[in-house]
Amino acid sequence: MSLTHTIDVDALHRAMHLLVRGFGSSDAEVRAVCSNLIEANLTGHDSHGIGMLPRYTDSYLEGGLKPNVHVRTVLDAGAMLRLDGQAGFGQVVGHEAMALGVERARQLGCCVMALGNAHHLGRIGAWAEEAAAAGLVSLHFVNVISRGIVAPHGGSDARFGTNPFTAAIPLKGRAPMILDFATSVIAQGKTRVAHNKGEQVPPDHLIDHEGRPTQDPRYSVIEPFGAILTFGAHKGYGMAVLCELLGGALAAGMAQHSDDTSKKRVLNGMLTVLIDPAKIADMAAYEREALAFVDWVTASPPREGFDRVRLAGEPERESRAKRTGNGVPVDATTWQEILNAANKLGVDPKKINDAAGVAA
């Protein structure tokens, strides 16, 4: 088991700001990237948090990540937008794309927004939360252009990415339902976290480089590579293909069909559907029935091993409250990878440690 540092949230922001400035990013970009990544840690999704910065660093040094660029409009057809992320930080171009889509959906009642060529968009739930905060329903289909890490159902090697699907449903007077999941049985970043902590993953999550079942996360992290399995067997596989065709081929004009493992960049395509419920529904009936259903479902008596029935998005909010008060846990291996990334960017690792309050 790896040693874990527990870092105060404000201190973590200061430390990560120092690192991200090493990309040559503007102050606004530094804030956007750090806020998004640390928010992922706060919600309990360390797989999409600051542990991604070493990968971003390698991508940047290879020329695959372009700091200080903004989303470009390729097509504006009223309720349909096609946007190019220009390989910029997903935390920046993703927010800009969502702002354009939200504005158009408010104006017209709906918007189909296609974003391509964005560097890693981070936790897709963050973009769904932006839609819900604007009172909109949203659906997000995302593909991944990088080293394949997930095997098709019945296949023995990796052919595509974790291809997340996300949805947001605003609920009157309550926090929204945010459904956000990888179509693989486990996110690749979670296998990285497990590997760094010296932990195994549960059974039926991974296969090794020969297609045999394994619980060792190293087969998703270091060569020889194996593959992660899809959730729910053929069902997750079907969802993964759906996300590849919609987020990749349709939205981005770029789908995964290469076995090149040499590049560190991670590009995402995202097809987003935004709907203003006030423009299509009887709002009184919608709000009444939505809350009635949610209350009916969550009132189910919990079975053994559970304290209560939760709605999607609740675990993240609970984690956010806990970690905001208690600090963010970062395993020592991941922290060392972050320090190594800082050094590659010309940032003194000691300054990162000092800002975070971590003893060298």
Task: Give the ranges of each region predicted by the language model.
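A generic, well-ordered mixed alpha/beta core segment in the N-terminal half of proteins
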Residues: 81-172
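Catalytic-core signal marking the mid-to-C-terminal active-site face
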Residues: 2-7, 12, 250, 255-360
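Active-site cofactor/substrate anionic-group-binding motifs, chiefly glycine-
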Residues: 48-102
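Small-residue-enriched flexible segments
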Residues: 187-252, 262-265
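Glycine-rich phosphate/pyrophosphate-binding loops
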Residues: 136-149, 246-260
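Phosphate/diphosphate-binding glycine-rich loops and adjacent basic-rich segments that engage nucleotide
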Residues: 148-220
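N-terminal glycine-rich anion-binding loops that anchor highly charged ligand groups
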Residues: 5-11, 25-51, 65-76, 264-267, ...
